[in-house]
Amino acid sequence: MTKVCPKTEEKRVVSEAVVEPISADVSFASNHFPTYKLGPDDQIVDEPDEDDKVPSVKDVVGKETGDLSDQHKKLSVRDLACKFDKNLAAASKLVDEAKLNDVTSLEGHVMLKKLRDALETMRGRMDGRNREAVEKAISMVEALAVKLTQNEGELIHDKFEVKKLASFLKKASDDAKKLVNQEKSFACAEIESARALVMKLGGAFEEQELCSKASRDQGPNVEKLVEEVQEARRIRRLHKPTMVIGMQHELRDLKSQIQEKSAYSVKLQREIAIIKKAEGSKSCPYVLDGAQSLGSCLRIRASSDSGIDISKCSIHWYRAASESSRREAISGANRSVYAPEPFDVGRVIQADIVSNGQKFTVTTDGPINTAAGLQSRVESLLRKSNSEFTVVISQMNGQDHASRSHVFTVGKARIKLSRGWITKAREIYSTSMQLCGVRGNANVPAKALFWQLRKGLTFLLTFESEQERNAAIVLARTYAYDCNVTLVGPDD
């Protein structure tokens, strides 16, 4: 062991005789104490060692970070990944060195502890100037312990920075590898796409060459065929115009003859039907009067020579596609008068009369025709969002109702009956709503309309004209159909 404060050879001999040797398991980094200076407040300041030029861990970390930020924009993705791998290895090495420094620091604390214990033992055995020297050595050992603690704090901070940098470099390395793999996959996809495009273009070029070659081979034949067709057309223009024109005139004459015969056939069929009906009516004591179109009334009356009271007969009306087809009963139509509605257009109207146990049937001469001007009237109303009609309430819930004029509004989503600001009834289109021409007793059946909002609430409305009534029915059914509702009469 080195001497603490030697003066003479005799004192050195006495010290060697008195001081006990230090344990042999303590190892020293050098054979002398490091040099220190006392700064303000008795703080120990290290004197720089000229031989020690190794940079600290903090300086190395700062330098590597600066180099990384400077070269980040200059490096490619692959070079950046390699650089991150190298820095990650360096950071791992620094972490290992920090672990070794922890072991060395622990050995330093053990060494200082044993040295201080030895000096304490020496101080108890010495006196005078030797005691002062030992106390000074103890204070130096304590200062060394404080300095070692400070160095350990700095080392812990550097270790934390190194770990932080290592995690950052590891993450950056993973991101760089991921980016490299992504760019590689993109490049492979582009290469495959370019390869497929090249193959497609090559196939198109080959096909074009084959087509051009085939066209060159077939060129003379095509030209020959074109010449033959042109020659044939020229010959046709020169020699056949009279025959073609004659055939066209013959076709026109044949068409006109067919149309005349068809019209004559229809006329004969109507005459035959009228004759048959007249023959059948000789045995039937009832006659059906009225025009067979919308806006009119079909009225059953007894023949002049029968003398039967029609009011005492049981009557029911039917509609059918033709006289021989299956009939459909018109619910509620049991009077001697019936006004056809738009639902009856194109159909034959029949009526069964039961009198004195005998059943008779009267039929219209043909299907019911639409009224003139009704289609254009409906088309003009469809351009509006709401259409208003002036009506009078004749009945409400089957009871006669004395009423003033009201406004019957047919909209795209609902029907409303109002007078001024007061709304009498309003309802949206639904399956419970019914709307049709009147079928029961009414003063003017051709102008009357039956409207059921819902069960328990019905109206019998009279319009200003037959056309307004039929237009309102067609318009309401069109809007209801757009709402997926079929708006018809009872049991239709």
From Swiss-Prot:
CDD domains: SCAB1_middle. Residues 112-132 form a coiled coil. The keyword Translocase does not apply. GO terms for biological process: actin filament organization; regulation of stomatal movement. GO terms for molecular function: actin binding. InterPro entries: SCAB, SCAB-ABD, SCAB-Ig, SCAB-PH, SCAB_CC. It is found in: Cytoplasm, Cytoskeleton. Pfam families: SCAB-ABD, SCAB-Ig, SCAB-PH, SCAB_CC. It comes from the Eukaryota. GO terms for cellular component: cytoplasm; cytoskeleton. Expressed in roots, stems, leaves, siliques and flowers. Keywords: Actin-binding, Coiled coil, Cytoplasm, Cytoskeleton. Belongs to the SCAB family. Probable plant-specific actin binding protein that bundles and stabilizes microfilaments (MFs). This is Stomatal closure-related actin-binding protein 2. It comes from Arabidopsis thaliana (Mouse-ear cress).
